[in-house]
Amino acid sequence: MTLRLFDTETRALRDFVPLAPGHASVYLCGATVQGDPHIGHVRSGVAFDVLRRWLLAHDYDVAFVRNVTDIEDKILNKAAEAGRPWWEWAATFERSFTWAYQQLGVLPPSVEPRATGHITQMVEMMQRLIDNGHAYAAGGDVYFDVRSYPRYGSLSGHKLDDVHQGESAGECKRDPRDFTLWKAEKPGEPSWPTPWGRGRPGWHLECSAMAEFYLGAAFDIHCGGLDLVFPHHENEIAQAKCAGDDFAQYWLHNGWVTMGGEKMSKSLGNVLSVPNVLKKVRPQELRYYLGSAHYRSMLEYSDTALDEGAAAFRRIESFVLRTQERAGEVPVGLWTEAFARALDDDLAVPAALAEVHGKVREGNIALDGGDLEGARGIASQVRAMLGILGVDPLDEHWTQETADASAATDALDVLVRAELERRQSARAEKNWAVADEVRDRLIRAGIEVTDTPNGPEWSLKAGQ
């Protein structure tokens, strides 16, 4: 079966036919690094990591670009409020996003360009737009003339009369529907030289210029969150087409993570940061949960839903680990036809997971019935399918994390045992003050101590 993808622009499932046979070029709108990532931010990374893995599994040479927006109004405002340099603020949270992606096992992109590193490409694209009659300079700003592009609105379905760019009208705009390509220099803000004066780039220009620079005038797939369809992606198309590029052939958009039916966002105050959620579940469990819904569907968050997702992953993991323990090494095998049909149908992960869980049930029956070779064969299939979804429990990414955690636990055990011996000695000497002080310090560190007939035992409190 041919891979079919839902293209936002045509509003239809389309067979994936790459521009160059055997090669796939993908651009994913990455983070605006204004603060710590929440699980809504990283859902797109997880969703389109599955697309990338599925293409790689079919021997495509995949060029995968994920940008970093490191200059933008929110970054400048938050850095100023905190009294920190804008570049330091951006770099700090870029590292936070990189850490989050790594924790969730998202493959690193082929390249991760920063907007500030591509001013030359942006200036060159603006010049082409002006030369082609699609942009104009006014008052130090540069604007895109929306009326000059007859197909404006083709991606989002917006009618020109209804367009609102979400930015100030601007005294120098010819039409309030025009959008900003370049912002004139303001006191205290970073700026770069251009033929039209110093300033900094508008949000939309960055991605068009970087996509063209790395993937060429035409490339296969452009991905991003549903909230980017308008105005960001609509404006990307307008810029690129009017600059002479064919641009993206397919447009894919993932749904939001919602809470109470509303999009998870910092402004609504319903943010769950990745570090905080990872206090509740392991990284592979969070990845399983974020990837368990169809990428185009909304994912309604609740603690119960997260726990159910984690439990579902542990059932799969338990089967694979039990099989390895009883039947020996479990190599990565081949996925099933049903799994392939599901992913070829617009990356239908829920149907793919239904196949995985069906195989796990079949494998557990074989394992419990003593058919070790049968269970081993099924576990090999399960590993192949989980690998595409990025949650194979025997993958080095997750086993290394487990090994690191085990080493950390061993080191902690040595330290805690030393404290417990000190507590035992104090109790034997009836020095209750010292014994209580040791106990209280361990409690503050998140360590619970239980006195047993065989001596004290310790454990980490839930969520530590």
Swiss-Prot record:
Record's keyword terms, sorted: Aminoacyl-tRNA synthetase, ATP-binding, Cytoplasm, Ligase, Metal-binding, Nucleotide-binding, Protein biosynthesis, Zinc
Subunit and partners: Monomer.
UniProt GO BP: cysteinyl-tRNA aminoacylation
UniProt name for this protein: Cysteine--tRNA ligase
Cellular compartment(s): Cytoplasm
Catalytic activity: tRNA(Cys) + L-cysteine + ATP = L-cysteinyl-tRNA(Cys) + AMP + diphosphate
Binding site for ATP: K266
Gene that encodes it: cysS
GO molecular function: ATP binding; cysteine-tRNA ligase activity; zinc ion binding
Entry note: cofactor: Binds 1 zinc ion per subunit.
Extent of motif 'HIGH' region: 31-41
Keyword RNA-binding appears in the UniProt entry: no
